[in-house]
């Protein structure tokens, strides 16, 4: 029963439930918790569960008007992180009804909205989420997916090759188009707008779209294969973004691009729906991801951002390169590359996968290896990423 004693109440009395059996419909989260000195890990884990679901800092009479048992998040398991002092993995189960269907925005607002500024925690990181089919089925997911993309491009059995046009800022639209033509004519499948190329004074978006489309069709005619240029539709408003996507559709180009973290999940999901309805592929750049995922003990791991993107919608997403980094990085990167491409991914802690994830029939996303790679990296990249990937040079 709800106690009405005045004052601050320990969260663990209500929200730490080690005997809880998780339901197939629960959304499960794994948090890396670093409590403040003197705060027991159970209290810290329960605080996260409470603050990201139904809890507040005291008992209020309106608690009696609803069923907390039905709606509260529960911290159901805590384990110390091996090799780290005062760090714990807290597992939290959220009832499905806490989340709006088909909204990545609402999912993140609930799970990571408030808790990260919490006084009882020194640091907090969301390491993984288990999205149940009951929830993932409320999302459209990628506009087309890997198989449909290959059919559209008529390119099979190999990674796709792309490059980013440089210098990324400062070229006129006509010279930019020239560079696109040379790259595509020379044998690349795709060229790419840089993520910062939107619509600046030296090159307005419509001029760029026209010259790139011209370059594309010329290269297609001369090579006899289908070519693409990721036209960056990211804009200051969602309406402007959709206007740019509509212009790309009218030009008949195969693919547009979006910066999904700076643009936001709501805008991204709208664009993904537009792309499916209008036969456009959607390339996703992850500008700003390191702000969120770089710290080991605070923020959100990229595998969560990647899962969220698969739900929100995108056909390609940048996912790091692995080349030249540590071995451990390689396994972790391959873990979230599998989460992007495969239907069913087994729990595997060595690859950072905390939960078994079943996507059922949601289309896959092509991982894009991009950032500081050159031709000598090719053998390593093809071995790491396999056929279903985009190797993006420049």
From Swiss-Prot:
Transmembrane segments: none
Residues recorded with modification N6-carboxylysine: 192
Principal cellular location given in the protein's record: plastid
Annotated cofactor note: Binds 1 Mg(2+) ion per subunit.
Binding of substrate, residues: 114, 164, 168, 286, 318, 370
InterPro entries from the UniProt entry: RuBisCO, RuBisCo_large_chain_AS, RuBisCO_lsu_C, RuBisCO_lsu_C_sf, RuBisCO_lsu_fd_N, RuBisCO_lsu_N_sf
ATP-binding as UniProt keyword: no
Disulfide bonds: none
Gene Ontology molecular-function annotations: magnesium ion binding; monooxygenase activity; ribulose-bisphosphate carboxylase activity
Role according to the record: RuBisCO catalyzes two reactions: the carboxylation of D-ribulose 1,5-bisphosphate, the primary event in carbon dioxide fixation, as well as the oxidative fragmentation of the pentose substrate in the photorespiration process. Both reactions occur simultaneously and in competition at the same active site.
Protein name stated in the entry: Ribulose bisphosphate carboxylase large chain
Annotated source species: Nuphar variegata (Yellow pond lily)
